[in-house]
From Swiss-Prot:
Site residues, Reactive bond for chymotrypsin: M143, L144
SMART domains (UniProt xref): STI
Main location: other
Alphabetical list of Gene3D superfamilies matching this protein: 2.80.10.50
Organism: Solanum tuberosum (Potato)
CDD domains: beta-trefoil_STI_CPI-like (cd23372)
Signal peptide: 1-23
Protein name: Aspartic protease inhibitor 8
Length: 220
């Protein structure tokens, strides 16, 4: 009997020693929480505000520069200007102010939002201030950015702002539902980069596979 008790104690000893190591001073390391989203900053280093207006300006200078503006699309029968363009140079007119409308809260990197030209307009043209991506253009073999979108709807009006590794930001088009036709939509989020194509001598914003538009945001 004494021999059995002795053997039982020997069996329990490692368990007691092992459990004693788990004290309040020696806790198991659990996976850390996801990092907080980073706010998008303007040219002055301030966080973008949904209630403020900004110009989208190119990082490049000269012919590589130019602000984003609202203009009339070639051959369009829309009653209001309905194209999203970039001026051909940073020497010239200022761009059309925009505001960024997040799903909720502030404006953060890699978060869905709507973009709207923030200008006075008649009631007929209100929807023609909201950015969206149009249908596949057969000539350019891509989709052009235009206005006529909606706010807060699961359609072609959602974008993201992503930080470049060194300086500035890119715009991404990110439809809520998988697009039927989107030649440059990639990865699990079906996002596509926004760049420019030349349309009738003007630089039109469009979805691109390479050379996206590198931009900054200047508060108005």
């Amino acid at each position: 009997m004494m021999k059995c008790l002795f053997l039982l104690c020997l069996c329990l000893l490692p368990i007691v020693v092992f459990s004693s190591t788990f004290t309040s001073q020696n806790l198991i390391d659990l996976p850390s929480e996801s990092p907080l989203p980073k706010p998008v900053l303007d040219t002055n280093g301030k966080e973008l505000n949904p209630d403020s207006s900004y110009r989208i300006i190119s990082i490049g200078r000269g012919a590589l520069g130019g602000d984003v503006y609202l203009g009339k699309s070639p051959n369009s029968d829309a009653p209001c200007p309905d194209g999203v363009f970039r001026y051909n140079s940073d020497v010239g007119p200022s761009g059309t102010p925009v505001r960024f409308i997040p799903l909720s809260g502030g404006i953060f990197e890699d978060q869905l939002l709507n973009i709207q030209f923030n200008i006075p307009t008649v009631k007929l043209c209100v929807s023609y201030t909201i950015w969206k991506v149009g249908n596949l253009n057969a000539y350019f073999r891509t989709m052009l950015l235009e206005t006529g979108g909606t706010i807060g709807q699961a359609d072609s009006s959602y974008f993201k702002i992503v930080k470049l590794s060194n300086f500035g930001y890119n715009l991404l088009y990110c439809p809520i539902t998988p697009p039927f036709l989107c030649p440059f939509c990639r990865d699990d989020n079906f996002c596509a980069k926004v760049g420019v194509v030349i349309q009738n001598g003007k630089r039109r914003l469009a979805l691109v596979n390479e050379n996206p538009l590198d931009v900054l945001f200047q508060e108005v």
